[in-house]
């Protein structure tokens, strides 16, 4: 998980390089909305620590991560994101859970890099950074072709992942 955060942060920083803000004295502030309280607070704590490690590796004082607590629910994810937006933050890493992205289209000036692996039904301003069903099936297909496997059986569970898997196939 730590390497995923490093890659995401480096990608964000590279995307920001061409902007004039990089050459300004101002800090580049990036939001981080994760569950900091409640049942999933250990996940949020781990993400905060991973992000700090990535920032230490980058070793540039211009970047600042500003956390917000989603409490692992969509209403608090929107509240935390709105609070970050009100501080002028327009790039936010998170939320972790797909359900928490439900109302984020209300902040259409903000780009979210969500840690969820679901891509079906996300708001247009949410980019999923997790490993999704499409990339998994592309890997399976590549393996099949390399090993000349002719037939494959796929069992799809009756769950909220069903539509995602059907789209990937």
For every predicted segment, state its role.
Residues 42-58, 76, 136-139, 160-169:
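Short, solvent-exposed amphipathic alpha-helices that sit
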Residues 31-49, 58, 68-70:
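Extracytoplasmic "Venus flytrap"
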Residues 4-24:
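Classical Sec-dependent N-terminal signal peptides that target proteins to the secretory pathway
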Residues 23-30, 61, 145-148:
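Immediate post-signal peptide segment of exported/extracytoplasmic ligand-binding proteins
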Residues 74-90, 142-143:
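Short, well-structured alpha-helical segments in soluble
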Residues 91-155, 160-168:
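Extracytoplasmic ligand/sensor domains, especially the bilobed periplasmic-binding protein
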């Amino acid at each position: 998980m730590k390497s995923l955060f490093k890659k995401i942060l480096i990608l964000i920083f590279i995307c920001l390089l061409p902007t004039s803000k990089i050459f300004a004295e101002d800090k580049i502030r990036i939001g981080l909305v994760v569950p900091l309280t409640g049942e999933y607070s250990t996940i949020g704590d781990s993400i905060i620590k991973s992000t700090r490690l990535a920032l230490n590796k980058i070793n540039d004082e211009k970047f600042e991560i500003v956390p917000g607590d989603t409490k692992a629910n969509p209403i608090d994810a929107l509240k935390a994101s709105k609070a970050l937006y009100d501080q002028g933050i327009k790039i936010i890493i998170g939320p972790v859970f797909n359900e928490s992205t439900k109302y984020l289209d209300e902040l259409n000036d903000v780009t979210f890099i969500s840690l969820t692996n679901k891509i079906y039904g996300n708001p247009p301003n949410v980019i999923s950074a997790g490993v999704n069903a499409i990339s998994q099936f592309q890997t399976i297909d590549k393996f099949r072709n390399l090993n000349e496997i002719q037939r494959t059986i796929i069992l799809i569970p009756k769950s909220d992942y069903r539509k995602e898997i059907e789209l990937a196939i």
